[in-house]
């Protein structure tokens, strides 16, 4: 475990000795869980290399984490069951309907406080594709806020304001798919093999037809089937939901590492809770409905472990699909 922690050293040099030691202790505590989760990839050397990369991701985020969020981490470590406190009271809303935009939340926070709200879920907040976007769940950029709601600075300000009033901010994080216009998909369409491998693409209908023998249709009326032909890819791409929502290949460790970075970047803006949207669909297995496969739990475990190392105040909430 010390070898894993050593990969973090170059990113922690600017921190105090106490803060560096705290990170190393967390790596030592959670490394076994991380490696067990990464065993999902079926190759010990690959799991180890992925763990090293994730520790580096965690170290960079930890070093950049604001002091007030480090303080929140310390408080949450002292009360690990904080979210199960009977006083916790959640409220979910569409930002534009409730407050107009992120800046408008400050005008409504007194109302939330009177209700006793301690947990605010803003649906969906990240930048979607233009046009049809599945109600905002076809994300074009996970690092940008919907332009009509504000920007990253507005998100940081809103999270800080809410936290000061005792309210934890929750946002949706779509894990199964990205919009066709996402930078990864655009690179894949442009011929970049690295990003093509982020998706499930097939040259002909042989494999898609075999999968579809047991796959239910999510939107049979207006988005039948689970695969879409794309001329630029010259292949059939897996699209569980809509033809503009491309499923990611979570058997590729690079996808896991990308989302670890996204989660920690948003956590450093003050997001405390992530609702993991469409998480049941992450792992594909021939002959099944490709939902709630055991590997999904291991992938979630790996992501959760990275958060526990870099930002232990963060909580995951998985969408249940049964």
Label every PLM stretch briefly.
Residues 262-265, 269:
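Pore-domain-biased detector for 6-TM cation channels and related repeats
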Residues 274-278:
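Extended, hydrophobic alpha-helical segments in both membrane/secreted and soluble proteins
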Residues 1-257, 268, 279-322:
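Acidic/aromatic-lined carbohydrate-recognition and catalytic surfaces
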